[in-house]
């Protein structure tokens, strides 16, 4: 406990920090109502990814008062749906001071500890399939979403444990941080900074196509939400909410082209070994 207190105090600073939370764009599995996996993006997910890149370039990377560039950080998980969502974000170099120190904007950092809750034997299933094949597990999860652990998988409590060192690292930053992540993981980060009870965190609203801006203050946390993409008629047939009510065939995707393009992407050189 003493060590954790010392670590916390060493990360405290007086500067107001801003954290931006974004779910990945709609994935192929979102469209099919499946959980887990490592699928690519649907066409709607790709549209959001492009819009996120524009938002970072035009808004997030600039000081709101002066319009001058401000240094920003970028985190993703190691799963391709977050990496593909962030790949349109530019990485220009900016000058930090008169001494010529440079900063690479949104230098991508890929973190396995940011990966979505692992669903174990239920990975790749819809909730209807889980209820049909594992009715007891389905009931247990409904009774205790926070503590329930998927067979051979994880629980929300497990994810809290692996997020702990990253939360402390976030506390130490003074630059804005954009986290492109997953619903379950972002729920817990959101709950931490807003002071939400962790039991309620399991159902916190982290919608697709939206950036949530959090500014932690002394006794509260300011929050704003900006919807970057509204589904259009061309998205008909796509499950815009990313839930498990989708039907029909697989949404058209851009995954193959994106995978080919990603070999020259800086993300490919910035992975970390698993720690759970």
Where are these regions (language model features)?
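Residue-level preference for the first positions of well-ordered beta-strands
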Residues: 19, 174-180
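Short glycine-enriched, charge-decorated loop/helix-capping segments at active-site entrances
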Residues: 34-41, 126-127
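Short, conserved phosphate/pyrophosphate- and ester-handling motifs at nucleotide-, phospho-/glycolipid
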Residues: 24, 45, 182
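Short glycine/proline- and acidic residue-enriched helix-loop micro-motifs
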Residues: 137-155, 241
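Short beta-strand scaffold positions
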Residues: 76-77, 161, 179-181
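Eukaryotic N-terminal low-complexity, Ser/Thr- and Lys/Arg-rich leader segments
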Residues: 1-17, 64-66, 98-101, 218-276
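Phosphate-coordination/substrate-recognition cap region in phosphate-metabolizing enzymes
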Residues: 3-8, 14, 26-29, 50-139, ...
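GST superfamily/GST-like fold recognition
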Residues: 183-187
């Amino acid at each position: 406990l003493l060590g954790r207190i010392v670590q916390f105090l060493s990360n405290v600073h007086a500067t107001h920090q801003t954290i931006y939370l974004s779910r990945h764009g709609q994935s192929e599995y979102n469209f099919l109502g499946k959980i887990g996996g490592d699928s690519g993006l649907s066409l709607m997910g790709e549209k959001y990814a492009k819009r996120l890149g524009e938002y970072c370039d035009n808004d997030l990377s600039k000081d709101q008062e002066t319009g001058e560039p401000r240094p920003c950080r970028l985190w993703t998980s190691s799963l391709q749906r977050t990496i593909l969502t962030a790949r349109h974000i530019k990485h220009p170099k900016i000058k930090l001071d008169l001494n010529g120190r440079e900063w690479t904007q949104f230098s991508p950092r890929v973190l396995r500890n940011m990966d979505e809750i692992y669903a174990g034997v239920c990975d790749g299933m819809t909730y209807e399939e889980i209820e049909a094949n594992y009715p007891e597990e389905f009931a247990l999860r409904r009774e205790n979403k926070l503590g329930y652990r998927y067979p051979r998988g994880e629980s929300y409590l497990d994810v809290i444990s692996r997020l702990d060192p990253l939360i402390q690292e976030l506390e130490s930053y003074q630059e804005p941080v954009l986290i492109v992540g997953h619903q379950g993981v972002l729920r817990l980060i959101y709950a931490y900074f807003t002071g939400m009870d962790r039991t309620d965190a399991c159902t916190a609203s982290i919608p697709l196509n939206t950036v949530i801006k959090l500014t932690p203050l002394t006794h509260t946390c300011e929050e704003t939400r900006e919807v970057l993409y509204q589904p259009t008629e061309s998205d008909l047939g796509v499950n815009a909410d990313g839930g498990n009510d989708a039907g029909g065939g697989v949404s058209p995707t851009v995954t193959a082209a994106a995978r080919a393009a990603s070999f020259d992407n800086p993300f490919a050189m910035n992975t970390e070994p698993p720690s759970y």
